[in-house]
């Protein structure tokens, strides 16, 4: 294979294609003479659209097919939304790069209302995320939450068709797709704690591919890596997949990393929170310790019930 070629395995959704195109542009800008090709693929999570994500089951719904392509030598790298990346990687693959984070917040999208507070009693809100559901229900038990699947365009079309009064989406995805004008308001991390890794893009490759690793190295963003490492460590200790009522959000100020975590009952009846801070070099330890605190407060009971119903 040409030393001047990199092939990116990517999902076919507009957002996944944007992420792959972004990495392609960055690589070609940094490395003169490098050619980057995209290999668009469908994954299990893209194909099964009529079932709530929590019931489709399994970790890595959106990445498995991409990983097979790399292991078979059909692709060199895969670009992922960090919130979709499983905790464990198949032998021979690893997360080589985490790019600088985009806005990690959730976005409130509605054609009629400005904020969640403005929604009338009984208004219908669309989201397939158990994390968002538990936080919305805790704040507004009078709202009706309905499942919402599909890519960003499909979800917006369902809102526009009048199926929902409002929907909740990741702000980063809307910004990347140049749809920021659809955002009625941003939901602060205090109001809706983001998913671990939300807004960050990760690049996976073969662990023994020195050529590709060297080409990818300039895209690594150290601060984002530390923040996401803490968030993912917490999620891992809680044994969370990508469809769980878990929120994790880290911020860095100087050498101090502050981490907030949340586990909630999807019906909003119970939300367990914890927060801690420490040296950013101990990101992983901080994440594990915060998970232990959540477990000590009763998080396991909630998560066991969620997994039993999945």
Swiss-Prot record:
It is an enzyme of class 2 (transferase). InterPro entries: HemC, Porphobilin_deaminase_cofac_BS, Porphobilin_deaminase_N, Porphobilinogen_deaminase_C, Porphobilinogen_deaminase_C_sf. It catalyses: 4 porphobilinogen + H2O = hydroxymethylbilane + 4 NH4(+). Binds 1 dipyrromethane group covalently. This is Porphobilinogen deaminase. One of its GO terms (cellular component) is cytoplasm. It comes from the Bacteria. Its EC number is 2.5.1.61. The modification S-(dipyrrolylmethanemethyl)cysteine is found at residue 242. GO terms for biological process: protoporphyrinogen IX biosynthetic process. Keywords: Porphyrin biosynthesis, Transferase. Monomer. The porphobilinogen subunits are added to the dipyrromethane group. Its cofactor is dipyrromethane. It comes from Shewanella halifaxensis (strain HAW-EB4). It holds the Pfam family Porphobil_deam. Belongs to the HMBS family. Pathway: Porphyrin-containing compound metabolism; protoporphyrin-IX biosynthesis; coproporphyrinogen-III from 5-aminolevulinate: step 2/4.
């Amino acid at each position: 294979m040409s030393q001047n070629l990199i092939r990116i395995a990517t999902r076919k959704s507009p957002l996944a294609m944007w992420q792959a195109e972004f990495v392609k542009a960055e690589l070609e800008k940094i490395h003169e003479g490098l050619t980057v090709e995209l290999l668009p693929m469908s994954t299990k999570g893209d194909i099964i659209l009529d079932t709530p994500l929590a019931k489709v089951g399994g970790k890595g719904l959106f990445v498995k097919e991409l990983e097979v392509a790399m292991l078979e030598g059909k692709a060199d790298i895969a670009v992922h939304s960090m919130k979709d990346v499983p905790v464990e990687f198949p032998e021979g693959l690893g997360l080589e790069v985490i790019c600088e984070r985009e806005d990690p917040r959730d976005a409130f999208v509605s054609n009629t209302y400005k904020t969640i507070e403005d929604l009338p009693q009984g208004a219908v809100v669309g989201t397939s995320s158990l994390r968002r559901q538990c936080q919305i229900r805790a704040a507004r038990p009078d709202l009706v939450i309905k499942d919402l699947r599909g890519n960003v365009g499909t979800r917006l079309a369902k809102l526009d068709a009048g199926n929902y009064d409002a929907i909740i989406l990741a702000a980063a995805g809307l910004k990347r797709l140049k749809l920021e004008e659809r955002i009625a308001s941003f939901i602060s991390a205090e109001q809706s704690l983001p998913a671990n890794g939300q807004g960050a893009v990760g690049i996976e490759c073969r662990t023994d591919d020195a050529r590709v690793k060297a080409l990818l190295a300039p895209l690594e963003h150290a601060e984002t890596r530390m923040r996401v490492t803490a968030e993912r460590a917490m999620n891992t200790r809680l044994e969370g997949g990508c469809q769980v009522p878990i929120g994790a959000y880290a911020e860095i100020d100087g050498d101090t990393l502050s981490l907030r975590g949340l586990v909630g009952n999807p019906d909003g009846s119970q939300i367990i929170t914890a927060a801690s801070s420490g040296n950013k070099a101990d990101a992983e330890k901080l994440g594990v310790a915060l998970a232990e605190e959540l477990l000590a407060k009763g998080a396991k009971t909630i998560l066991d019930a969620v997994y039993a119903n999945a």
